[in-house]
């Protein structure tokens, strides 16, 4: 292929004269995106938890949330390392670059970032046609979801990322963009941190119309909220769960979670046809 270049989400330019052949992905969603872009066979390393697609489970592990195994990374001789802007430590990225590795840092904050990242990987991996097709399919599905809920009455939502302590996300998180697609708004959008601990008192003050719990268990955490019967969401029975695996991975599968969230939130509107103002989608 001819020489190509991309600009990562730090603003750093990466140039290549040939497709990357040995790739390490430092986050589960990045591993998945390489497969989506049509280059799963180029992966030589992953971090713990990178379990989708199933083929990824056979890859060598080079670390986890606690840190990276730099000796293992050096031994695998990657010609491209994929890092997650808010999920990998800056010091680790800088150390990899000092070793001479090309590091692409991606930081998805909006639904639109997912197809952009797929296309970017297609450029670097020489799988442009397949990556473009995957990106187009994702955009088409995301657009249909937006149109389905455009103009619906707005619903305020608390997303529970963790129960003890109670952790939620702010308006810059991709989960907030999913909520916007559903015609909803994040009740804690104004938090200064991407993910932060909030108190029960803060939730009582915000009094969201619905609570969405990220969990693989259908009834995870819902019983705990029954201690707060004055919450609108508790009174209305508007406490829902969504697969944490789907909603927290910035890949095409996030739309599976989005479709469930949107349908759950729409059920609140069906119960309260006169509720809130239209969503500004």
Where on the chain are the PLM-derived regions?
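Short helices/loops that flank or line small-molecule/ion binding pockets
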Residues: 70-77, 99, 198-207
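A ligand-binding cleft/hinge motif common to bilobed small-molecule-binding domains
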Residues: 87-98, 210-227
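Short, structured coil segments at secondary-structure junctions
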Residues: 39, 57-58, 99-100, 182, ...
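N-terminal hydrophobic or amphipathic helices and topogenic motifs
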Residues: 1-22
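His/Asp/Glu-enriched short active-site or ligand-binding loop at hydrolase and phosphoryl-transfer sites
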Residues: 47, 171-195, 215, 240-241
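Short helix-initiation/N-cap motifs at beta->coil->alpha
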Residues: 7-11, 62-71, 87, 191-201
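A short, structured surface patch at a secondary-structure boundary
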Residues: 21-76, 80-87, 187, 215
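Extracytoplasmic substrate-binding proteins
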Residues: 12-13, 79-80, 84, 90-167, ...
